From Swiss-Prot:
<keyword id="KW-0808">Transferase</keyword>
<feature type="binding site">
    <location>
        <position position="77"/>
    </location>
    <ligand>
        <name>S-adenosyl-L-methionine</name>
    </ligand>
</feature>
<feature type="binding site">
    <location>
        <begin position="128"/>
        <end position="129"/>
    </location>
    <ligand>
        <name>S-adenosyl-L-methionine</name>
    </ligand>
</feature>
<comment type="function">
    <text>Specifically methylates the N7 position of guanine in position 535 of 16S rRNA.</text>
</comment>
<keyword id="KW-0963">Cytoplasm</keyword>
<dbReference type="Pfam" id="PF02527">
    <property type="entry name" value="GidB"/>
</dbReference>
<feature type="binding site">
    <location>
        <position position="147"/>
    </location>
    <ligand>
        <name>S-adenosyl-L-methionine</name>
    </ligand>
</feature>
<dbReference type="InterPro" id="IPR003682">
    <property type="entry name" value="rRNA_ssu_MeTfrase_G"/>
</dbReference>
<dbReference type="GO" id="GO:0070043">
    <property type="term" value="F:rRNA (guanine-N7-)-methyltransferase activity"/>
</dbReference>
<feature type="region of interest" description="Disordered">
    <location>
        <begin position="219"/>
        <end position="238"/>
    </location>
</feature>
<dbReference type="GO" id="GO:0005829">
    <property type="term" value="C:cytosol"/>
</dbReference>
<comment type="similarity">
    <text>Belongs to the methyltransferase superfamily. RNA methyltransferase RsmG family.</text>
</comment>
<keyword id="KW-0698">rRNA processing</keyword>
<dbReference type="InterPro" id="IPR029063">
    <property type="entry name" value="SAM-dependent_MTases_sf"/>
</dbReference>
<protein>
    <recommendedName>
        <fullName>Ribosomal RNA small subunit methyltransferase G</fullName>
        <ecNumber>2.1.1.-</ecNumber>
    </recommendedName>
</protein>
<keyword id="KW-0949">S-adenosyl-L-methionine</keyword>
<feature type="binding site">
    <location>
        <position position="82"/>
    </location>
    <ligand>
        <name>S-adenosyl-L-methionine</name>
    </ligand>
</feature>
Amino acid sequence: MKPEQFVHALKEKGINLSEKQTEQFYIYFQELVEWNQKVNLTAITDQEEVYVKHFYDCVTAAFYHDFNQEISICDIGAGAGFPSIPLKIVFPQLKITIVDSLKKRITFLNHLATKLELSNVAFYHDRAENFGKNKTFRESFDIVTARAVARMSVLSELCLPLVKKNGVFIAMKGAQAKEELEVGKPAIELLGGEVEEIHTFSLPIEESERSIILISKKRQTPKKYPRKAGLPNKEPIE
């Protein structure tokens, strides 16, 4: 997907990018490729692939949920900033918090935010399990997102504790989403969530399957969750 195809594909979905936003995506691509030589950020560095598999893929969340308002988003394990930085470029009024366990990635994100002239972005070098226990952040976000970080049973324990009541957890997954969801349902319910919608679609041009799962936060998460770092992955709630 060439940059101009990216702009056109979003336009078809009712998202019109300004020249500044188009330029921000191009700078993002350049910085990603340059920094990737010294920090492991992505296996995808070809321009056309970055535009479809990273940029377009991230913005698909906005096809199924309204981001056109002043809302706070926490992105767990964002790595190189996916999905929250592409969403922030498209919807500048969003308040973004990114949590990642690798310091080098946080350094990249701070640099990127400066280059892209982004405001209302905060980056935390922390484990999601510890961050979710922090009273300042626990149950404080309108939306929590994660993109292909872990399977649903694990992801729910990392993300749902951070979602405020009546907020939304948006999980961005690949082709295996429905199977993962079946296994993950006990965890979702235990942690106060309820599956609202699942959307499955193919990316344009290269046609790999994607799923977006919307989970609403109906009840407070029990205090014992998330458990200590490493345990959700080692002993998932299933």
